[in-house]
């Protein structure tokens, strides 16, 4: 039995889909992400307490 490229691609897609689903269940939903780009600073998933606000209030977009 020989596998074609389409069969291999389909198998890879299935493995990738299962991996993404498993990762979604294993990863905590309380991840704090701070993304600093040239245009903006984005903060998501963080708990905004007094200490956190003091640490991040001076963040600004990266300058080139």
Swiss-Prot record:
<dbReference type="Pfam" id="PF02495">
    <property type="entry name" value="TGBp3"/>
</dbReference>
<keyword id="KW-1038">Host endoplasmic reticulum</keyword>
<dbReference type="GO" id="GO:0016020">
    <property type="term" value="C:membrane"/>
</dbReference>
<keyword id="KW-0472">Membrane</keyword>
<feature type="topological domain" description="Lumenal">
    <location>
        <begin position="1"/>
        <end position="7"/>
    </location>
</feature>
<keyword id="KW-1043">Host membrane</keyword>
<keyword id="KW-0813">Transport</keyword>
<protein>
    <recommendedName>
        <fullName>Movement protein TGBp3</fullName>
    </recommendedName>
</protein>
<dbReference type="InterPro" id="IPR003411">
    <property type="entry name" value="TGBp3"/>
</dbReference>
<keyword id="KW-0916">Viral movement protein</keyword>
<comment type="function">
    <text>Plays a role in viral cell-to-cell propagation, by facilitating genome transport to neighboring plant cells through plasmosdesmata. May induce the formation of granular vesicles derived from the Endoplasmic reticulum, which align on actin filaments.</text>
</comment>
<keyword id="KW-0812">Transmembrane</keyword>
<dbReference type="GO" id="GO:0044167">
    <property type="term" value="C:host cell endoplasmic reticulum membrane"/>
</dbReference>
<keyword id="KW-1133">Transmembrane helix</keyword>
<dbReference type="GO" id="GO:0046740">
    <property type="term" value="P:transport of virus in host, cell to cell"/>
</dbReference>
<comment type="similarity">
    <text>Belongs to the Tymovirales TGBp3 protein family.</text>
</comment>
<feature type="transmembrane region" description="Helical">
    <location>
        <begin position="8"/>
        <end position="28"/>
    </location>
</feature>
<feature type="topological domain" description="Cytoplasmic">
    <location>
        <begin position="29"/>
        <end position="64"/>
    </location>
</feature>
């Amino acid at each position: 039995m020989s596998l074609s490229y389409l069969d291999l691609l389909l198998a890879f897609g299935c493995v990738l889909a299962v991996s993404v689903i498993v990762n979604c269940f294993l990863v905590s939903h309380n991840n704090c992400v701070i993304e600093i780009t040239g245009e903006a600073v984005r903060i998501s998933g963080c708990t905004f307490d007094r200490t956190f606000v003091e640490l991040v209030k001076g963040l600004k977009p990266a300058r080139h």
